[in-house]
Regions:
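A short, conserved alpha-helix within the catalytic core of class I
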Residues: 2-15
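Short, flexible active-site-adjacent loop segments at beta-strand->alpha-helix junctions, enriched
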Residues: 3, 27, 63, 84
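Conserved beta-strand signature within the Rossmann-like core of class I S-adenosyl-L-methionine
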Residues: 18-30
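Core SAM-dependent methyltransferase catalytic element
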Residues: 64-102
Length: 102
């Protein structure tokens, strides 16, 4: 759970064809729930989704919302794949519930 923006595009670019990126970290609004609260370390709205589109990844799942597994937090989650890939190999799932569970 650490955001270092200067390396986000590089991280996505390191994926080989069929490679998968699963990423979760805190988003703007998390200040209401605790740390991190520094905007430099909080994702902007749809930032992970835009990263995937900008770097040519296919989004298998994206979420932005509150979870309270250990304590409430506002997070973004992304599951994406570098094409080409077999679409049947990626199970699509529904959004998380309040506990962060599908």
């Amino acid at each position: 759970h650490f955001l270092f923006r200067p390396r986000l595009d590089l991280l996505a670019g390191l994926l080989a064809a069929g490679g998968r990126l699963i990423y979760e970290t805190f988003a703007v609004g998390n200040e209401a729930y605790g740390k991190p609260s520094n905007p430099a370390f909080l994702l902007r709205p749809d930032e992970l989704f835009r990263l995937a589109r900008r770097t040519g990844l296919v989004v298998a799942g994206y979420e932005h919302g509150v979870t309270d597994r250990q304590q409430p937090a506002l997070v973004q989650r992304l599951a994406a794949v570098r094409p080409p890939f077999d679409p049947e190999s990626i199970p699509l799932v529904g959004p998380m519930d309040r506990r962060g569970v599908r």
